[in-house]
Amino acid sequence: MSDLNQSKKMNVSEFADAQRSHYTVYPSLPQSNKNDKHIPFVKLLSGKESEVNVEKRWELYHQLHSHFHDQVDHIIDNIEADLKAEISDLLYSETTQKRRCFNTIFLLGSDSTTKIELKDESSRYNVLIELTPKESPNVRMMLRRSMYKLYSAADAEEHPTIKYEDINDEDGDFTEQNNDVSYDLSLVENFKRLFGKDLAMVFNFKDVDSINFNTLDNFIILLKSAFKYDHVKISLIFNINTNLSNIEKNLRQSTIRLLKRNYHKLDVSSNKGFKYGNQIFQSFLDTVDGKLNLSDRFVEFILSKMANNTNHNLQLLTKMLDYSLMSYFFQNAFSVFIDPVNVDFLNDDYLKILSRCPTFMFFVEGLIKQHAPADEILSLLTNKNRGLEEFFVEFLVRENPINGHAKFVARFLEEELNITNFNLIELYHNLLIGKLDSYLDRWSACKEYKDRLHFEPIDTIFQELFTLDNRSGLLTQSIFPSYKSNIEDNLLSWEQVLPSLDKENYDTLSGDLDKIMAPVLGQLFKLYREANMTINIYDFYIAFRETLPKEEILNFIRKDPSNTKLLELAETPDAFDKVALILFMQAIFAFENMGLIKFQSTKSYDLVEKCVWRGI
């Protein structure tokens, strides 16, 4: 009997597992040999590239990538250091010390992670009071938290052994536990008498856009009353993620005038001017100098994408430069020769491509027009006596005049003319297309140095082999893919996505079916394109069923004699209808997950609505 009761006991874990709506399967991955080198590059030159050259390409890419990112990391670290220094200068400027008003700092584009560092002064106690939207439901709670943080920070300096914990809004016993802390401005009024120092309070309001503006307004007015105490100085820092006009619109005008008596604005979104963007682009030019060129099409692509993005320009710029470097090394067999030492690997497979380069052919055409010796021309075309090979090596060790002149102009503008509000990327683009003079006309100080700054763009031989470009749109599709168009194109032209059917030992029956019928999603999508905006689900199914190859499908489900369930299904008169319905339901639910259709918000499921369609 006890065994029977034991068997009837519910297994709680099994019961809980049975209530799950879905299951996650983690397939086991094959263990890789640690000694094996996994290089994510493929052999180029129609598969004729040696493994040594593939490895060399990977090593060169890794070197340039590491060098570039080391410089970017250094620039990003400097941004935070520069920002801290700017905020500190504003908090402790001499004009701020003398005026009896708020010292207001608006941090524009802030994600509220900016760290505020205060100085240690012998005659004044500096305290940082940070308030989040959660800590600011009303004026009483804001004041309560502020005074507690002020008292605990000041008392901790007087008595370092005492530890203070952050207060909890839901702690009802907090007031009883801390009766010595008064939740009005009496602590501020008596601060010098209690601690023997002047007081400088810095309020850091985080995520201001989410704080109740009426509460914030009243709290600022309350703090204003502290100006009657000579020993008190108050600074207000507002972390604004949207824009200043949003704050001005929601606070009272009298409060705005009070804040703007002494205020400063800082753009902390890392997009301030062109300073840091110029530094990152300059570091990239330094990384590829003497190795790679940048095409005007590629630089124009960078400018256009950055113009459409105002919040994360530095991250976007780094991403585009990084990806362009990777794609170049991945698809260009000649990238191995950016290190002239590797010229020993130059063979006929490379030389055939060299002789067909447009810039090289143009150069040879010029030699013919100049009536150069026939032997010299033939040695270049046929590599007779290693003529083409030596000519290519000579090209590799030449300096890039474009990058050098771009650095010269940028340095001249900053050091000689004190001009810093220029976009180095735009300057470089104008340099490439021969419009540098017109770009520099926007600064009158450049007019008398036009001859010195002028540059005539030149084409270098074999430049197409060593140039970062966006000719095929690879960067555009990889970094900014058109998801909708890609999905639709892949559903329509599935042959370009799935593996080729022309394989040895391919199952004849499966192959015949695949050649006649597209994948289920592609098969249904053809009908989807032709359907109206609102689709009757039954009519949709009937149309789908009629497009399926009936005989091939029935032959396919009969092909495995060991699968008795499929054989039984094949013998039923409505076998094809059942299979068609299963395929249709799979495709319909896949379309819903992909966002192509949605069921109408009614109890009837007879109709579905198209979410994406072409031509409208």
From Swiss-Prot:
Give the Gene Ontology MF terms in alphabetical order.
chromatin binding; DNA replication origin binding
Top-level taxon in the UniProt lineage = Eukaryota
Which InterPro entries did the record assign? Answer: EF_Hand_1_Ca_BS (IPR018247), ORC3 (IPR020795), ORC3_N (IPR045667), ORC_WH_C (IPR040855)
Q: Name one Pfam family in it.
A: ORC_WH_C
One GO cellular component, as annotated: nuclear origin of replication recognition complex
Q: Which CDD domains match?
A: Orc3
**Keywords, A to Z?**
Acetylation, DNA replication, DNA-binding, Nucleus
TM segments? none
Q: Which residues carry this modification: N-acetylserine?
A: 2
Q: What's a BP term from Gene Ontology annotated to this protein?
A: silent mating-type cassette heterochromatin formation
**Coiled-coil blocks:** none
What is the annotated localization of this protein?
Nucleus
Function in brief: Component of the origin recognition complex (ORC) that binds origins of replication. It has a role in both chromosomal replication and mating type transcriptional silencing. Binds to the ARS consensus sequence (ACS) of origins of replication.
Q: What family is reported?
A: Belongs to the ORC3 family.
Note the subunit structure.
Component of the origin recognition complex (ORC) composed of at least ORC1, ORC2, ORC3, ORC4, ORC5 and ORC6. Interacts with ORC6.
By what name is this protein known?
Origin recognition complex subunit 3
What is the originating organism of this protein? Answer: Saccharomyces cerevisiae (strain ATCC 204508 / S288c) (Baker's yeast)
